[in-house]
Amino acid sequence: MREPTNRQGSPGPGEPRPPAQGRPRFPTWILWVALLALALWNVYTFFWPSSGARLNIPYSAFIQQVEGENVSSVTIRGQRVSGTFTEEVRVAGDQVLSPGDPVPPGTSPNEIRTGTQFQTTIPENSQTELVPLLQSHGVTVKIDQAGGSVWPSLLATIVPLFLFIGLMVYLGRSMSRGQQNVFSFGRSKARVYDAERPRVTFADVAGEEEAKAELSEVVDFLRNPMKYHAIGARLPRGILLVGPPGTGKTLLARAVAGEAGVPFFSVSASEFVEMFVGVGASRVRDLFERAKASAPSIMFVDELDAVGRQRFAGLGGGNDEREQTLNQLLVEMDGFEPHQDVIVIAATNRPDVLDPALLRPGRFDRQVTVGLPDRRGREAILRIHTRGIPVADDLDLEELAAATPGFSGADLANLVNEAALMAARKNKKIVERIDFDEALDKIVLGTERAMIMSEHDKRVVAYHEAGHAVAAHFSPGTDPLRKVSIVPRGQSLGVTIQAPEEDRFNYSRAYLLARLTVMMGGRAAEKLVFNEMTTGAQNDLKEATLLARRMVGLWGMSDEVGPVYLGMGEQHVFLGREIMQDRDVAEATLERADEAVQRLLREAMERAEQLLRKYRDKLDALAEALIAEETIGQEKITEILGAPPVPSAAPAAAADSV
């Protein structure tokens, strides 16, 4: 299946601009190093204009040293004169001290400098008089004509100034970009899939024919909007895809965009909400503006319940930021201009928690149920996912679809991928049915565990699973057995798998009672054979109790309570909602319901014990076979137990594990 290439949308409306790639960026550290070096150089030249060994002396002291024959050479650079004394001198402030001269009072030792290198500044137009004086005293004179140029000092002043200005401009632009980044929190993060990209079509979607038929009307509207506008028809502004996880809600939305050939804006509802208050509402506005600018277009919001959850539900009040986002979404959806040609498609697997204002006509006024595929749908999905995989010629996808009841499209895709991994691990060139069987066991039961068990524990587990199998085989109306194993997988020490012959969507009381009997078969076998009870029945008791509570409190299948709905056995996602809801049931009724649950479980235990005592020889034979072979398939089970007394019905699959 081809997926459309996704790219980030641009901040503004219209055609998105892909981000620049490979754009050279100036290394900012070079600018900082250069600026620091120039600053240090200017500071150094300001405080130490020449080498640190040169003594700054007044011009008058310089003339005294020349007349005293203590100057050997000088270099004249404009008005700056530097040179070398014949003998070392001391300088205290502005005075040059000859050897033997006293130090002026009040002069600290740190203020006295000594050396032979000096520099001074001569008055203007004094060079013509100075040179003959120097020559008359035998001083070597060097004239540096470049020293009179103003360019070095000019450059030393201008270059740092321009560098400083450049740095300020750069920092200003960086701050501007930073402000844009701050304000970009309000930009939508929607990904855009346009018509020029590889697209998903309805041919890539299988098992949801009813949903595809519903959405084909949307496709026709986007292709031929004038046909609907001409007669005054208006397409639903919002379409809500409802279904369990993994059933293909997002894939259906992409298929609608691919069939219609219009821009497709995809965003997760959780991306609307950020740490800053008001960002979510701003992103909603931005997303709708972009979608309107690209009309006709499709806007897809995944996991709508992240922001569309009912306001002020549960304890502790609501979330102000999320509710602001929801309010903005409500306003935008109800504020479309007529015939805007923008369709909002959203997906959720929790429609029961959505705010009622979202579901009213004018917003999400059409709901499309995307349920689990049936047997034919699973076969079609398997054909799509095996198109690019070399499978064995004798692989029966119809039979494989029958062995995977309750699997969603995502589950089937995972099954095909796991089977391919199994085959690759064995260095096979094609994927065979045994690879699919191993992948199915791994997904449903978990990975095999290398576990060393004592002979007694192994025997207990074998009889436990054999008890489930015998109860399932000889209880009328149960699902046929597919496999029994005492190989530890996942959290279980063993497993008994029952596979249905057909999909069933309605369950009778007789079938549910038989299921309770099968669940109690493991504990009954432990009591019958070992006269002991183990912790291996924990999961069986949990599932049996939950099923019995539903039979009594949800489906009205007990004589003590009668046909009444008590809400027992329901799963409450929000703790606050469960605590705050009213209890319209009397305590006496709840007590009778508990007694009815206990009676159902006791009777199931008695039926299981009767079956195992009646077929004790079958129980022993199956347990010994499990101890010897660890895993027994359907043919071996039939060989040991024989044919079931009554043809089995076709309910949904089940697995009982220790």
UniProtKB/Swiss-Prot annotation:
Regions crossing the membrane: 29-49, 150-170
Organism: Sphaerobacter thermophilus (strain ATCC 49802 / DSM 20745 / KCCM 41009 / NCIMB 13125 / S 6022)
One GO-annotated biological process of the protein: protein catabolic process
Primary location group: membrane
Region (Disordered): 1-22, 95-114
Name of the featured protein: ATP-dependent zinc metalloprotease FtsH 4
Signal sequence interval, chain numbering: none
Example of a GO cellular component annotation carried by this entry: plasma membrane
Residue sites binding Zn(2+) per the record: H464, H468, D540
Domain of life, source organism: Bacteria
Matches recorded under Gene3D superfamilies: 1.10.8.60, 3.30.720.210, P-loop containing nucleotide triphosphate hydrolases, Peptidase M41
Major enzyme class: hydrolase
Assigned keywords, A-Z: ATP-binding, Cell membrane, Hydrolase, Membrane, Metal-binding, Metalloprotease, Nucleotide-binding, Protease, Transmembrane, Transmembrane helix, Zinc
Cytoplasmic side: 1-28, 171-658
Keyword Metal-binding: yes
Annotated family: In the central section; belongs to the AAA ATPase family. In the C-terminal section; belongs to the peptidase M41 family.
Role according to the record: Acts as a processive, ATP-dependent zinc metallopeptidase for both cytoplasmic and membrane proteins. Plays a role in the quality control of integral membrane proteins.
Cofactor: Zn(2+)
Active-site feature positions: E465
Record EC number: 3.4.24.-
One Pfam family in the UniProt entry: AAA_lid_3
